[in-house]
């Protein structure tokens, strides 16, 4: 069997309300445990509309047919009216996920806020924003959260430093291959990072493959040994939990037939994380994704 980390990002109110229950049913049917990362504060995702002025973001939205893929309620959330509080209204679904023995971690307090502003926030603001999310999710789950995954992979040396204050078991904040410990400002290795090395649906559909070709494309990637193990695959509750739910169900069935076993990210950690190699988490770019994002780099 080939173990592949399965990360599920839940960005929005609709993704939590509609996508998570269906994903829980699908994963239970296939006897799979995964890592869910929840946005718990206001759903302001519609405020990304201003980014349509940027050619790369506009192209991405057009080629992925975003209006039908995500729905107008997601694309307009938090624009003409205050964003709904995801955690306050839908916290029970986060508890359901935890009770089903999936790994549950923090994605963001305000997904839009993190993705749009991380690059200019100072360390105190980064800590405050993370604290808002951690406190809310702790209260929802009635236990302490021990892992996180940065919204939109917006992470750099400063966010890495800021997250050290929370004692997470691991973070999944960047793209790249192979687990590592990012170097902090004082040269010490920090909390383990579990990078994502496989592309997401919206990064390749419309440029490399069609929607109908996506499963075959992804299965080929999953079955190809990574340059540095392990494979880590990210899906979104707003996509694979709603519009592409049947296609994702089929992908899981075929993956199992090919000897692929999806596992929570935390199970990829070695018994002694201190033995992981050191690395750097830096800003970079990725085909199919607009703007900068965190990337693994060698020391």
From Swiss-Prot:
Its EC number is 3.5.1.n3. Pathway: Glycolipid biosynthesis; 4-amino-4-deoxy-alpha-L-arabinose undecaprenyl phosphate biosynthesis; 4-amino-4-deoxy-alpha-L-arabinose undecaprenyl phosphate from UDP-4-deoxy-4-formamido-beta-L-arabinose and undecaprenyl phosphate: step 2/2; Bacterial outer membrane biogenesis; lipopolysaccharide biosynthesis. Residues 2-263 form the NodB homology domain. GO terms for biological process: 4-amino-4-deoxy-alpha-L-arabinopyranosyl undecaprenyl phosphate biosynthetic process; lipid A biosynthetic process; lipopolysaccharide biosynthetic process; response to antibiotic. GO terms for cellular component: membrane. GO terms for molecular function: hydrolase activity, acting on carbon-nitrogen (but not peptide) bonds, in linear amides. It comes from the Bacteria. Keywords: Antibiotic resistance, Hydrolase, Lipid A biosynthesis, Lipid biosynthesis, Lipid metabolism, Lipopolysaccharide biosynthesis. It catalyses: 4-deoxy-4-formamido-alpha-L-arabinopyranosyl di-trans,octa-cis-undecaprenyl phosphate + H2O = 4-amino-4-deoxy-alpha-L-arabinopyranosyl di-trans,octa-cis-undecaprenyl phosphate + formate. Belongs to the polysaccharide deacetylase family. ArnD deformylase subfamily. Catalyzes the deformylation of 4-deoxy-4-formamido-L-arabinose-phosphoundecaprenol to 4-amino-4-deoxy-L-arabinose-phosphoundecaprenol. The modified arabinose is attached to lipid A and is required for resistance to polymyxin and cationic antimicrobial peptides. This is Probable 4-deoxy-4-formamido-L-arabinose-phosphoundecaprenol deformylase ArnD.
